[in-house]
Amino acid sequence: MDFPDEWTQKEFMQNKIKLEKEGVKVVLVDTILSPIEKAETTTYNPHEFKNYPDGTVLVFYCDSGKATLDRLKEYKERFPQHHCVSLKGGRGYWRKNMMLLDEDVL
């Protein structure tokens, strides 16, 4: 799979389901110490990421998505064994009650 620089919330949810069925770990990474309600997140911890399997997808988020997109090159250099993506719109655009319908799943 070719990974773009950004995923929307819907793309994140779709790709998480698809990739985890294929055995690929997908992690939503909190860079602002502010978890997203009703979402499984992990706090940014570079030492912990070293323990993740190679090929893990790290989806970084901040308040607006701008800071993580600006730092994406740095994340990709720091974690070359993983795929790094920024969450478009960040925490501010996350819809806590958004659900995927069967036809939405890739």
Go through each PLM region and give its residues.
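Conserved beta-strand segments of alpha/beta enzyme cores
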Residues: 27, 40, 83-85
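Compositionally biased low-complexity segments enriched in polar/charged residues
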Residues: 39-45
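Flexible, polar/low-complexity N-terminal or interdomain linker segments that lie immediately upstream
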Residues: 1-38, 106
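Active-site neighborhoods of enzymes that stabilize oxyanions during catalysis
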Residues: 98-106
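N-terminal beta-loop-helix "entrance" segment that forms/cooperates
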Residues: 37, 96-98
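Catalytic cysteine-centered active loop of the rhodanese-like fold, especially the PTP/DSP P-loop
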Residues: 46-96
